[in-house]
A protein has these predicted regions:
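Thiotemplate assembly-line natural product biosynthesis machinery
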Residues: 1-21, 73-79
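Phosphopantetheine carrier-protein modules
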Residues: 15-33, 52-59
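Short, cationic-aromatic polyanion-contact patches
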Residues: 66-73
């Protein structure tokens, strides 16, 4: 399963299941779609545990976490 698929599955099935049927495109803003700071932390833990990529805390910034596309790019840069 690709990083994109893993992220989408986790976001839609675990973190924000109510958004699953009307989920925006991968370049849409995750915070506008309902992601909050608690869910973001859960997502970053998921990336470390399940995708096996450690994302440095000092690199967390709005442009890296604003969309599925941005997250995939950031994760792939640390593989």
């Amino acid at each position: 399963m690709s990083v994109r698929e893993q992220l989408r599955n986790y976001l839609f099935e675990t973190l924000m299941p109510a958004k699953r049927d009307a989920w925006p495109a991968d370049d849409s803003d995750l915070f506008d779609a309902g992601l909050d700071s608690l869910r973001l932390m859960q997502l970053l833990v998921f990336v470390e545990k399940e995708i096996k990529v450690t994302l440095p805390d000092h690199e967390v910034s709005p442009d890296r976490i604003e969309s599925v596309n941005a997250l995939v790019e950031w994760i792939e840069s640390h593989r």
